[in-house]
Curated annotation (Swiss-Prot):
InterPro entries: NqrDE/RnfAE, RnfE. The keyword Metal-binding does not apply. The keyword Membrane applies. It is found in: Cell inner membrane. Its EC number is 7.-.-.-. This is Ion-translocating oxidoreductase complex subunit E. HAMAP family: RsxE_RnfE. The chain crosses the membrane at residues 63-83, 93-113, 117-137, 152-172, 206-226. Pfam families: Rnf-Nqr. Part of a membrane-bound complex that couples electron transfer with translocation of ions across the membrane. Keywords: Cell inner membrane, Cell membrane, Electron transport, Membrane, Translocase, Transmembrane, Transmembrane helix, Transport. GO terms for biological process: electron transport chain. The gene is rnfE. One of its GO terms (cellular component) is plasma membrane.
Amino acid sequence: MTDLTEKNTALEEEKIESAVENQQKSIWKEIFAQGIWKNNPAVVQLLGLCPLLAVSSTATNALGLSLATMLVLTCTNTVISLFRQYIPKEIRIPIYVMIIATTVTAVQLLMNAYTYTLYQSLGIFIPLIVTNCIIIGRAEAFASKNSLLHSIWDGFSMGLGMALSLTILGALREIIGQGTIFEGIENLFGEQAKFLTHHIYHTDSSFLLFILPPGAFIGLGLLLAIKNRIDNVKK
């Protein structure tokens, strides 16, 4: 009888452990899905439109700024989650901005040192990451309320979702506007990445509509339409 009770207890414990493990896995998956698709910063929340529209004239510029933004998001989420219990609620926003500004400054110095040509190309939009609503929004909505590991994963997922949207938009505008893709990628990853540059078609003059800001609005509209169409089909 005692053996049977012990076996039943062990089985119950295994079931509980399995349920907890499955719940943890579903949390990680949901955070990732929110960042990449369900709550994508660019095509769902429509945040960070200033760099999205201004810098996405080429895939290389878009990828460079999006990687910088992803790094800042991940780092700020990490720091804010780590010290969330010590940050006074009354002055939390100024503290978040200081943390974000410090991280952006570090990223800016790194880009100035290692990717100088891209740094010059992006110009004012690197320091403007400080004012990006995505970063302060994730700090307030997620990092200040959740565990360290979940906050790191949320920052990475949201940053990756932003990076994918920005790079796709940049690639679309570059292909239609100039007939190339990843032109100047060596400025970001070095000469070994030059094989990624491709000339899709030859043109004597650029298609200015897609290179200039109106092309960014058209491209973003196409991305929004495609995403909404996919969501409607899934329903």
